[in-house]
């Protein structure tokens, strides 16, 4: 896991999952920061 800060702000404790080596993650920004997510969830972008 890697701690990442979303470019649009918001930072909750926790870590975003890593993308396994040799693979590509689905790159979609569907949130605007941790504050836009339900309580206890993080906004992660790979």
Curated annotation (Swiss-Prot):
InterPro entries: Elafin-like_sf
GO biological process: antibacterial humoral response; innate immune response
Keywords: Antibiotic, Antimicrobial, Protease inhibitor
GO molecular-function terms, A-Z: serine-type endopeptidase inhibitor activity
Occurrences of domain WAP (ranges): 12-46
CC per GO annotation: extracellular space
Keyword Cell inner membrane: no
Summary of the function given for this chain in its UniProt record: Has antibiotic activity against several equine uterine pathogens; S.zooepidemicus, E.coli and P.aeruginosa. Highly efficient against S.zoopedemicus. Not active against K.pneumoniae. Selectively inactivates microbial serine proteases (subtilisin A and proteinase K) without inhibiting mammalian serine proteases (human neutrophil elastase, human cathepsin G and bovine pancreatic trypsin).
Record-given protein name: Antimicrobial peptide eNAP-2
Species for this entry: Equus caballus
């Amino acid at each position: 896991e890697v701690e990442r800060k979303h470019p649009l702000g918001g930072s909750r404790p926790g870590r975003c999952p890593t993308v396994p080596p040799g693979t590509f993650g689905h790159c979609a920004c569907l949130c605007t920061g941790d504050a836009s997510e339900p309580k206890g969830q993080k906004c992660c972008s790979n």
